Amino acid sequence: MSFPSLQEQLDIITANTVEIISSAELEQKIQHSIKTGAPLKVKLGADPSRPDLHLGHSVVLRKLREFQDLGHEAILIIGDFTAMIGDPSGKSKTRPQLSAEEARENGASYFEQASKILDPHKTTICYNADWLGNMTFADVIRLSSHYTVARMLERDDFERRYRSSEPISIHEFLYPLAQAMDSVHLRNDVELGGTDQKFNLLVGRDLQREYGILPQVCITMPLLVGTGGEDKMSKSLGNAVCFNDLPSDMYGRVLSIPDTLIENWCRLLLPLTGEGRRAILEGWEEDPRTAKRRLAREIVMQYYSAGEAGAAEEHFDRLFVHKQAPTEIELTRFSEPELPLVDLLTTLGAAASKTDARRMIQQNAVSIDEEKITDVKTIITLSDEPKTLKAGKRKFFRIATAGNS
């Protein structure tokens, strides 16, 4: 198999990266790959702690796709076993553990979602429970002997918790070792991860060396800042744009980012080559509004068709530029003629909880037939005549009693 030249590959592989450990070893591995015609084995792990992937995950997935396009082997690890431990990276307290059923259920759609970026025909997918689940307690003891508590406490998050007398469970020490066993089992050449995964990646590198395997090169990628412009993207923080969001929701959420994120999102989320990326980078400072609209369109097109991206833009303009309600809103009918507004919002899925519903009402984010409602104790009276409920900027519902159609 023939590969692009060393420099061509390095230009693509090193773009947007934070750290490569080590660059010299990466060059050696690429040169050996070119000489032998054997592709590099490039690994990316994802613990299915939640069922949805978001744009933050796409940063490392896109780097894995770049390796694919260069002719290398992409290995996507679904960490169904390690998810039952819980990754402590960046956490100030112990993360809740998932059951085996929850981990498998969440992981079931990961490959389908990741395939919106990866070439599914050139991707090897593995579940680490297939090998970690077969380890005996004696195997775990032997594995633990390869690493010391002192080394574990070099992690910033562990050190902070230790200094502040916050509890650290033994199973959290086992997490990086379990993830490192993935690298031992697969004998991969390269591992990708966000900057918060650096310690885990290095443990994999060390453990490969302990087992007599040529150590992997570790490549870390930036953590994508969420839509609010401050914290890293996280669904739990409510600042995420998910792969499975509706095109109109995805478009609107991208447009909600502060102008200061346009360049960063463009560099991290769009392919290295392409007219859209180039146009955004050249013009965002002079005309951020136009650049952001193009960015939103380009991002939606990665997960949906160009036609759906165009329809999402038209939907946004109709709602927020021309101030028109959506032309088609599904009608939901209720058997009760009167319902507390808080219950109505949670039942419709407009609010994640009653607390969230009260917050929305108090922040003037809820209206019925264009009339703002600010009293959290409001009771809504329904009839056969549908009412239009608006929650937040983009959620519309038509509601009525379960009478005549």
From Swiss-Prot:
It is an enzyme of class 6 (ligase). This is Tyrosine--tRNA ligase. The gene is tyrS. Pfam families: SYY_C-terminal, tRNA-synt_1b. Its EC number is 6.1.1.1. GO terms for molecular function: ATP binding; RNA binding; tyrosine-tRNA ligase activity. It is found in: Cytoplasm. One of its GO terms (cellular component) is cytosol. One of its GO terms (biological process) is tyrosyl-tRNA aminoacylation. Keywords: Aminoacyl-tRNA synthetase, ATP-binding, Cytoplasm, Ligase, Nucleotide-binding, Protein biosynthesis, RNA-binding. A motif ('KMSKS' region) lies at residues 232-236. Gene3D superfamilies: HUPs, RNA-binding S4 domain, Tyrosyl-Transfer RNA Synthetase. The keyword Disulfide bond does not apply. It comes from the Bacteria. Its main location: cytoplasm. SUPFAM superfamilies: Alpha-L RNA-binding motif, Nucleotidylyl transferase. Homodimer. InterPro entries: aa-tRNA-synth_Ic, Rossmann-like_a/b/a_fold, S4_RNA-bd_sf, SYY-like_C, Tyr-tRNA-ligase, Tyr-tRNA-ligase_bac-type, Tyr-tRNA-ligase_bac_2. A motif ('HIGH' region) lies at residues 48-57. Belongs to the class-I aminoacyl-tRNA synthetase family. TyrS type 2 subfamily. The keyword ATP-binding applies. It catalyses: tRNA(Tyr) + L-tyrosine + ATP = L-tyrosyl-tRNA(Tyr) + AMP + diphosphate + H(+). ATP binds at residue 235. Catalyzes the attachment of tyrosine to tRNA(Tyr) in a two-step reaction: tyrosine is first activated by ATP to form Tyr-AMP and then transferred to the acceptor end of tRNA(Tyr). It comes from Chlorobium luteolum (strain DSM 273 / BCRC 81028 / 2530) (Pelodictyon luteolum). Residues 339-400 form the S4 RNA-binding domain.
